[in-house]
């Protein structure tokens, strides 16, 4: 029997079929935090706001952010350090006839030194076993600060109890909290 599993989801009015291997984060359903990030992004930039823009999805997983952004017309690069997730992302792109790059990478190591982006998105992992670890999010914020073009936009979604605000202020100066529900988009 195949290890592959699939599920469908409607995101911002469009249908997607996602594929995943066992052990992939949020397998079987789109994480509500990712949905909130996409809603905030569309409200902030408008329905055509990503078309033709270069987007980096840090910690892309199976593509909950990458696939919708690609369908909206963005040129998306999804980076992910978990190989099962990268394979899941590639299969999801094929199944939905979408184009994006899916790179197996520890943070941004697979990117060229000069790669810069108009928009960077992330729903960073923060659990290692049962512990809350912010090291990955710290690395993602550092990469976003280094890889964002002038005038670019960085979207990070997290649980409200995670205090990313001082880190964002240190790296970017000003930032806005766009949405707060069970998660917050910064």
Residue ranges and their predicted role:
Residues 80-85, 136, 159-160:
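Short beta->alpha hinge that forms the Motif I/post-I loop of the SAM-binding pocket
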Residues 1-50:
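SAM-dependent Rossmann-like transferase core, predominantly class I methyltransferases
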């Amino acid at each position: 029997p195949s290890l592959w599993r699939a599920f469908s989801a409607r995101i911002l009015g469009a249908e997607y079929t996602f594929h995943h291997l066992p052990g992939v984060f949020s397998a079987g359903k789109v994480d509500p935090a990712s949905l909130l990030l996409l809603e905030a992004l569309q409200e902030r930039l408008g329905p055509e706001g990503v078309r033709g823009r270069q987007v980096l999805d840090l910690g892309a997983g199976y593509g909950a952010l990458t696939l919708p952004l690609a369908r909206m017309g963005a040129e998306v690069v999804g980076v992910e350090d978990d190989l099962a997730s990268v394979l899941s992302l590639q299969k999801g792109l094929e199944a939905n006839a979408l184009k994006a790059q899916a790179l197996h990478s520890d943070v941004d190591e697979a990117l060229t030194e000069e790669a810069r982006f108009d928009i960077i998105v992330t729903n960073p992992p923060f659990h290692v076993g049962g512990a809350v670890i912010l090291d990955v999010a710290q690395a993602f914020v550092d990469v976003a600060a280094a890889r964002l073009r002038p005038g670019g936009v960085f979207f990070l979604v997290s649980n409200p109890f995670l205090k990313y605000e001082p880190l964002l202020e240190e790296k970017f100066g000003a930032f806005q909290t766009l949405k707060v529900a069970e998660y917050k988009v910064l």
